[in-house]
């Protein structure tokens, strides 16, 4: 086992705070409408230019192991806030730095770290309650656009496109962000349920212009096994042919004789059929087939529930107004499923989302909710260079998370004003002893830090602006973009309540851990082995020229 280097007490805390300051100073430069850019070196290709706090934090590793531990703990604040609320990483870092710096000073002055932590926790609890009281629900598109604009570093085009996407696919709909091919941002909306499987044979194409198979008012057969024997399909095919409607078959696989017969029937015009593979794999495939069954009002033909394909009738099939099948995608539009059944299924999936700990599973479950609840919107980000594209895409993703958070818990006045207004509730608190009361004072000062930093980045005097904001009430604050004072809501400067709350809670959590740290352990630096001595020349080689 490698030897360890151990630091105690004041020495440990000083090094840790030094690391915190290095990371926080780099990150907080990006805060506010006049935040500065940070340039990140890449191992290959051009450097990345960003105003995204979490991107800066992720890049930072310090040479000193003890300083690096401090930096990594604050990085955790940024990424945890990003995971919870999707934004607010820079605010969380600024709050954490302020709490840790003041807390470390108090511990150095001989105060009890545990009492300081209790005081900070008490203050944060009161501030969170006050934030919820100030919060207003987000209902209209304008507020959603404003939140998106602020989160995207005051880019109105991003705020507007997100609001439009939410309007089209609903609050539950999935909105994905992709790199576009043009200079402008574009919005593509897929209505209904789309999955990434196309037709199994090009002979199913009936729309030569779009190279797709379009079915109007079709029946939909859902089967969780392979279909290779055409005899199994005959009862369903006969029923569909009598009804004079087209048929979409979604199965694990359609092959051999069965596929050949379907192609021949389609070409001859006896019955219009399109066969596609079921999406997903394993349990996820079964779940998605069940989703389709609920959406279309059909039944999944599965031997697990005692249904054999040869016994299936037209009553077991789902219906939809339209189905479009391209080479790569299938879209079911306006399924005939019962609304109550769809809502119940959505509720069931939402419960699974709450229970899962895997980010990947959560994302896939959210996609399923969206496909059942309304549709999928794709924002294609446009830019003139690859560097700009990456930076803009990161901002769009941030703004999207922020708007979702705003819809979830409402909004508060932005620009650091909400935390300043929450000071009133915290200022009335008293601790059980002097050290706890000092902990409350530390939290009070830290809650002013985001506004101070926004003002400093805009090139103004933080104390002067802060005092003027404190003299006002309600939504009154400072618009750093144009240097005006006024109603932040009217200016359209809003922050999601969830973002501000998460930033404060996560910052206090890490600050509490750091203040109460008494020892740090890291691997001792390895001493370089002495190099081998140079070898002598071979005998008998004297006088030779090389």
Swiss-Prot record:
Enzyme Commission designation: 5.6.1.7
Short name of one Pfam family: Cpn60_TCP1
Principal localisation: cytoplasm
One record GO biological process: protein refolding
Binding-site list for ATP: 30-33, 51, 87-91, 415, 479-481, 495
Keyword Transferase: no
Domain of life: Bacteria
Enzyme class: isomerase
GO molecular function: ATP binding; ATP-dependent protein folding chaperone; isomerase activity; unfolded protein binding
Biased composition (Gly residues): 534-546
Region annotation Disordered: where it falls in the sequence: 526-546
One GO CC term, this protein: cytoplasm
Catalytic activity: ATP + H2O + a folded polypeptide = ADP + phosphate + an unfolded polypeptide
Entries under CDD domains matching the protein: GroEL (cd03344)
Cellular compartments annotated: Cytoplasm
Keywords: ATP-binding, Chaperone, Cytoplasm, Isomerase, Nucleotide-binding
Role according to the record: Together with its co-chaperonin GroES, plays an essential role in assisting protein folding. The GroEL-GroES system forms a nano-cage that allows encapsulation of the non-native substrate proteins and provides a physical environment optimized to promote and accelerate protein folding.
Oligomeric and partner information: Forms a cylinder of 14 subunits composed of two heptameric rings stacked back-to-back. Interacts with the co-chaperonin GroES.
Family from the record: Belongs to the chaperonin (HSP60) family.
The protein, known as: Chaperonin GroEL
Native organism: Xanthomonas euvesicatoria pv. vesicatoria (strain 85-10)
Taxonomic lineage from the root: Bacteria, Pseudomonadati, Pseudomonadota, Gammaproteobacteria, Lysobacterales
Gene that produces this protein: groEL
């Amino acid at each position: 086992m490698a030897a360890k280097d151990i630091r105690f007490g004041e020495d440990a805390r000083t090094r840790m705070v030094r690391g915190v300051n290095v990371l926080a100073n780099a990150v907080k430069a990006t805060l506010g409408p006049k935040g500065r850019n940070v340039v990140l070196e890449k191992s290959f290709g051009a450097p990345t230019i960003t105003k995204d706090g979490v991107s800066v934090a992720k890049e930072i590793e310090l040479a000193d192991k003890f300083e690096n531990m401090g930096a990594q703990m604050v990085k955790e604040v940024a990424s945890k806030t990003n995971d919870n609320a999707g934004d607010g990483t820079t605010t969380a870092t600024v709050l954490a730095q302020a709490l840790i710096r003041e807390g470390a000073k108090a511990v150095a002055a001989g105060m009890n770290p545990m009492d300081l932590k209790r005081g900070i926790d008490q203050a944060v609890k009161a501030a969170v309650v006050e934030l919820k009281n100030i919060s207003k629900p987000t209902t209209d598109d304008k507020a959603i656009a404003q939140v998106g604009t602020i989160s995207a570093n005051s880019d109105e085009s991003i705020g507007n496109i997100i609001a439009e996407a939410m309007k089209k696919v609903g609050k539950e709909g999935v909105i994905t962000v992709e790199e576009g091919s043009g200079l402008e941002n574009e919005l593509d909306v897929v209505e209904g349920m789309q999955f990434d499987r196309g037709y199994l044979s090009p002979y199913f194409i009936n729309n030569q212009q779009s190279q797709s198979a379009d079915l109007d008012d079709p029946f939909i057969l859902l089967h969780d096994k392979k279909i290779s024997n055409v005899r199994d399909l005959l009862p369903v095919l006969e029923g569909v042919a009598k009804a004079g409607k087209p048929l979409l078959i979604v199965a694990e696989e359609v092959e051999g004789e069965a596929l050949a017969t379907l192609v021949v029937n389609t070409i001859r015009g006896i019955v219009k059929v399109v066969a596609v593979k079921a999406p997903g794999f394993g349990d996820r495939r079964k779940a998605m087939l069940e989703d389709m069954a609920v959406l279309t009002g059909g039944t999944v033909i599965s031997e697990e529930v005692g249904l054999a394909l040869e016994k299936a009738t037209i009553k077991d099939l789902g219906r939809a107004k339209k189905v479009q099948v391209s080479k790569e995608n299938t879209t079911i539009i306006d399924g005939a499923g019962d609304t109550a059944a769809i809502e119940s299924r959505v509720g069931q999936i939402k419960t699974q989302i709450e229970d899962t700990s895997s980010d990947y599973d959560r994302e896939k479950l959210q996609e399923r909710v969206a496909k059942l609840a309304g549709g999928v919107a794709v924002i294609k980000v446009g830019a003139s260079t690859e560097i700009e594209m990456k930076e803009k895409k990161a901002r769009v993703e941030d703004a999207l998370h922020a708007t979702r958070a705003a819809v979830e818990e409402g909004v508060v006045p932005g620009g650091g004003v909400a935390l300043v207004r929450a000071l009133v509730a915290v200022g009335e608190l008293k601790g059980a002893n002097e050290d706890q009361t000092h902990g409350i004072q530390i939290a009070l000062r830290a809650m002013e830090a985001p506004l101070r930093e926004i003002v400093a980045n805009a090139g103004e005097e933080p104390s002067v602006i802060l005092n003027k904001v404190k003299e006002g009430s309600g939504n009154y604050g400072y618009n750093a973009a144009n240097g005006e004072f006024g109603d932040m809501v009217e200016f359209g400067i809003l922050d999601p309540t969830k973002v501000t709350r998460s930033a404060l809670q996560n910052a206090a959590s890490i600050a509490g851990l750091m203040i109460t740290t008494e020892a740090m352990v890291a691997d001792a630096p390895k001493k370089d082995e002495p190099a081998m001595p140079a070898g002598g020349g071979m005998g008998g080689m004297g006088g030779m020229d090389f």
